[in-house]
């Protein structure tokens, strides 16, 4: 059984939890900047976060193929699947999505593109347009100062580590609970949002 309005790549586990496997990409420009998406919770408009490009793995796709497709759809950037680095990281995430708790098993890759590569959101699906706000380039060193949520939470440190290359170690973060009940206070995010806007484009 599919995950209701979540999309066709979601299924229901025996306990009713919506679940999918996903592939994600940490994208670096040749200038060292990193590409992130920003999204919001439609049911909690005050909650906004940054996350990596990526999404569900479709039937017949490998994680690498899914990562390339998602990068094209969400950011308008095309890369050869063979130039992706990794997988560099895996994790299981539990989070709120369209008013329910879901679980997603994720595998991460690295991609490198020319500095200043223009991004496009023309390929966003209806589901993505319902919660995604923008795709933008960040200076890697600035991520540590962001007080909005970032997923995974370890991303700022990982970006600093991977910016100069990957040492071949696959990091396994295990299960990470990102539901609202354990999230950072919304007031902290709201207070910082004005200073973040425009700083990272």
List where the protein language model places each region.
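Acidic, metal-coordinating catalytic segment for phosphate/diphosphate chemistry
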Residues: 1-30
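Hydrophobic (often cysteine-bearing) scaffold residues that line and stabilize catalytic clefts
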Residues: 19, 59, 63, 151, ...
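Short connector loops at helix/strand junctions that flank enzyme active sites
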Residues: 20, 45-47, 52, 102-106
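Entry beta-strands of beta-propeller and related beta-repeat scaffolds
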Residues: 33-34
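Nudix hydrolase/Nudix homology domain
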Residues: 48, 116-201
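Unchanged
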Residues: 57-148, 189
């Amino acid at each position: 059984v599919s995950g209701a309005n979540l999309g066709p790549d979601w299924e229901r586990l025996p306990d009713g939890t919506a679940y999918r496997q996903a592939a994600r990409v940490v994208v670096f420009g040749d200038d060292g900047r990193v590409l992130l998406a920003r999204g919001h919770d439609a049911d909690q408009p005050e909650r906004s976060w940054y996350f990596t490009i990526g999404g569900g793995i479709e039937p017949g796709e490998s994680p690498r193929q899914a990562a390339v497709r998602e990068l094209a759809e969400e950011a308008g950037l095309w890369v050869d699947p063979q130039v992706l680095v990794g997988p560099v990281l895996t994790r299981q995430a539990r989070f709120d999505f369209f008013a329910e708790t879901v679980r997603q098993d994720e595998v991460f890759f690295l991609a490198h593109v020319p500095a200043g590569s223009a991004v496009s959101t023309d390929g966003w699906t209806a589901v993505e347009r319902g919660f995604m706000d923008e795709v933008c380039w960040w200076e890697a060193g600035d991520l540590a100062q962001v007080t909005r949520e970032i997923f995974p939470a370890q991303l700022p440190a990982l970006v600093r580590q991977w910016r100069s290359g990957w040492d071949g170690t696959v990091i396994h973060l295990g299960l990470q609970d990102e539901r609202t009940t354990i999230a950072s206070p919304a007031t902290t995010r709201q207070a910082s949002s004005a200073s973040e806007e425009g700083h990272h484009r």
